[in-house]
Amino acid sequence: MYIENFLLLASALFCIGIYGLLTSRNIVRVLMCLELCLNAININFIAFSNFIDYEKINGQVIAIFIMTIAAAEAAIGLALVLTIYRNRETVDIENFDLLKG
């Protein structure tokens, strides 16, 4: 396999994720698109690590670190969405005006 294939896949996933972030009004869908972007970044790190130097595992270590951060972000994000849904009964981003002033 060539590195171009992995980079093409990662860029397609990243573009789909950014499109979803910019156009979606559902907060759960926004979190899913953010996870898609993070997975595209992981593909890039692993592909570059594999094709540049076979001996070192720096790309894999960074990818595991990003997966850990993404899992924590997803858990906290979904907990916040669930709490806001219980109070507001909606998951629409436009209705998240929780600041009073």
Swiss-Prot record:
<dbReference type="GO" id="GO:0048038">
    <property type="term" value="F:quinone binding"/>
</dbReference>
<keyword id="KW-1278">Translocase</keyword>
<dbReference type="GO" id="GO:0009535">
    <property type="term" value="C:chloroplast thylakoid membrane"/>
</dbReference>
<comment type="function">
    <text>NDH shuttles electrons from NAD(P)H:plastoquinone, via FMN and iron-sulfur (Fe-S) centers, to quinones in the photosynthetic chain and possibly in a chloroplast respiratory chain. The immediate electron acceptor for the enzyme in this species is believed to be plastoquinone. Couples the redox reaction to proton translocation, and thus conserves the redox energy in a proton gradient.</text>
</comment>
<keyword id="KW-0520">NAD</keyword>
<keyword id="KW-1133">Transmembrane helix</keyword>
<keyword id="KW-0521">NADP</keyword>
<keyword id="KW-0934">Plastid</keyword>
<keyword id="KW-0874">Quinone</keyword>
<keyword id="KW-0150">Chloroplast</keyword>
<keyword id="KW-0812">Transmembrane</keyword>
<dbReference type="InterPro" id="IPR001133">
    <property type="entry name" value="NADH_UbQ_OxRdtase_chain4L/K"/>
</dbReference>
<keyword id="KW-0813">Transport</keyword>
<dbReference type="Pfam" id="PF00420">
    <property type="entry name" value="Oxidored_q2"/>
</dbReference>
<feature type="transmembrane region" description="Helical">
    <location>
        <begin position="61"/>
        <end position="81"/>
    </location>
</feature>
<dbReference type="GO" id="GO:0016655">
    <property type="term" value="F:oxidoreductase activity, acting on NAD(P)H, quinone or similar compound as acceptor"/>
</dbReference>
<dbReference type="GO" id="GO:0042773">
    <property type="term" value="P:ATP synthesis coupled electron transport"/>
</dbReference>
<keyword id="KW-0618">Plastoquinone</keyword>
<dbReference type="GO" id="GO:0030964">
    <property type="term" value="C:NADH dehydrogenase complex"/>
</dbReference>
<keyword id="KW-0472">Membrane</keyword>
<dbReference type="GO" id="GO:0019684">
    <property type="term" value="P:photosynthesis, light reaction"/>
</dbReference>
<comment type="subunit">
    <text>NDH is composed of at least 16 different subunits, 5 of which are encoded in the nucleus.</text>
</comment>
<feature type="transmembrane region" description="Helical">
    <location>
        <begin position="32"/>
        <end position="52"/>
    </location>
</feature>
<protein>
    <recommendedName>
        <fullName>NAD(P)H-quinone oxidoreductase subunit 4L, chloroplastic</fullName>
        <ecNumber>7.1.1.-</ecNumber>
    </recommendedName>
</protein>
<dbReference type="InterPro" id="IPR039428">
    <property type="entry name" value="NUOK/Mnh_C1-like"/>
</dbReference>
<keyword id="KW-0793">Thylakoid</keyword>
<comment type="similarity">
    <text>Belongs to the complex I subunit 4L family.</text>
</comment>
<feature type="transmembrane region" description="Helical">
    <location>
        <begin position="2"/>
        <end position="22"/>
    </location>
</feature>
